Amino acid sequence: MFGMKSRKKSATLLLTAVMSLSLFGCSTGNTTTGNAAQPAGEGNAAAAAESKAKAAGGKLVLYSAGPQKLADNIVNEFTAKTGIEVEMFQGTTGKILARMEAEKANPVADVVILASLPSAQALKADGLTLPYPEAANADKLNKDWSDAEGNYFSSSASALGIVYNSKLVTTPPKSWADLATSAWKDAVNIPDPTLSGSALDFITGYLSANGEKGWDLLNAYKANGVAMAGANQEALDPVITGAKSIVAAGVDYMAYSAKARGEPLDIVYPEEGTVISPRPAAILKSSSNVENAKAFIDYLLSDEAQKLVTDAYLIPGREDIEATNRANVKDIPQLKVDWAWMSEHGVEIAARFSEIFK
């Protein structure tokens, strides 16, 4: 099921799965049963989710890329509304794909939520997704982030920026190129694109916009002591503590959330543009709880769930909703990226990047 059909067809999925397997094996996650109080709730999408779930009964198995608190809140509210027990594995996109690869002979998940659009595109290309074009509120989603045929739905997104320690950095850099200057020698981390779906989105997106010359910047980063430092949280933690000053391609919701908790962090979106990384959810064709999976997608796109998304400092996937606690899409300069190209070239780019930064 997950065999290498072609480099173009499932490149990102297989690269991330195989490399993550080598590092993590079959790591275990959290099993969560929603038990929150029944929310008031409004909206046709939530009603549709409740109706479908009551008709189906049973459970749902969800594999979800972070943030953990958001995933827990969505699961708890969905369970409170529908009575459906949700078993959740929570991890990075790489860990989720590795787990799916390990389970390919006996698939377990009903729904996956990933932090990388090309990974969802690869799932669709491999015929592993179950289309659900009639999902409630799907017509309100950002069309560039979701599948027109209903194979995946980006219910949220994050942008990649320059995240810095505001105690150490008084004049933050304004462009990606600034991080290759002597002012930031040995002071910068960057997440590992084989462990972070959003980091892979940034690197492939930057190269899709800048072509082969984009590698000049990445090579300059290496020469300036930029360190490839694990997944997103592992790259960010040394900046919070002051061991490093900056994360290049830092995930913005982590910065906003940490800043709200009182950590000395802030973020800059470089003037030449960045990548906004959608977070797609998909029903798997192998699901044994299809009606529950559809109900979950309906809930994920509901007003209630989108409020939970904005509370977690993420960009809502629906275009009719804006966050009030962070920058919205219109506020963020964006690179002109080609998602199809990014998906096609993910393997070679991640391998080349890892070779440079190893």
Regions found by a protein language model. Name each.
Residues 1-59:
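Short, low-complexity disordered leader/linker segments with a strong preference
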Residues 43-85, 258-259:
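Short, polar/charged alpha-helical segment
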Residues 61-71, 91-95, 107-244:
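Extracytoplasmic ligand-binding site segments that recognize negatively charged/polar headgroups
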Residues 118-122, 245-264:
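A ligand-binding cleft/hinge motif common to bilobed small-molecule-binding domains
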Residues 158, 218-222, 228-229, 261-285:
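Periplasmic-binding protein-like
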Residues 161-168, 204-207, 277-289, 308-309:
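A bilobed periplasmic-binding-protein/Venus flytrap-type ligand-binding module shared by bacterial periplasmic
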Residues 212-214, 317-358:
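An extracytoplasmic/periplasmic, membrane-proximal ligand-sensing/linker region
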Residues 275, 284-337:
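Mature extracytoplasmic/periplasmic domains
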